[in-house]
Amino acid sequence: ELIRRSNKSVIERIRMLEDEQNDYRDYIESWVHEIKAPITSIQLACENHKDEVTRQIGLENQRIENDVDMVLYYARMEKVYKDYMIEETDLGKAASEILIKNKYYLISNGVRGEVECPDLAYTDKKWILFILNQLMLNSVKYKSENPKVHPYIHIYTERYGHGVRLIVEDNGTGIREEEMSRIFEKGFTCLL
């Protein structure tokens, strides 16, 4: 009887924690969608009134939008298997969308972007956009500071067998060998 009551108590506590976690995730998703409205308004205002000040505001606004997107994706990570929508995706359009979204960030950091992706692939478009965006942000963040190096990010595809490889290449500083085992840790930042 004692074990049964103890198990019941533990199960009730687990359900309560799961409910709290779901409520928190719902709150985060709601907050992200609410904050996107002013982000879009700022973006439109900056595009309609171009000068040095609005260009800088637009850059910072883009950083905020990228961080907000990251919050949303991390909030959804636990239920990622429910969030997949596998469909035929134009990889060139996806890569171009990321470069266009971040064009001011790329330009202000002197990074040239190039896309050569004539292929289609079956993938989840939201997640491939998120991954490409993170790789692009890291390419800029870890670009070479050597003035003789002209930073670039090159996104292209290669066919192999019946599949397609999506390759993201840059000429940045790279990740040190001793840090490679940590690259998939949440929040990992490599040393410069």
Q: What feature does the model see in each segment?
A:
Residues V71, L135:
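Hydrophobic residues in the alpha-helical elements that line and stabilize the ATP-binding pocket
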Residues V80-Y84, L120-T123:
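Conserved micro-motifs of the catalytic ATP-binding
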Residues E88-Y104:
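Short beta-to-alpha transition helix within the HATPase_c
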Residues G110-L120:
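Conserved catalytic submotifs in the C-terminal HATPase_c
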Residues N138-K143:
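Short helix-loop "hinge" at the ATP-lid/N-box region of the Bergerat-fold HATPase_c
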Residues H150-H162:
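Short beta-strand/loop element within the Bergerat-fold HATPase_c
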Residues D170:
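Acidic ATP/Mg2+-coordinating residue in the GHKL
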Residues I175-G187:
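Short conserved segment of the HATPase_c
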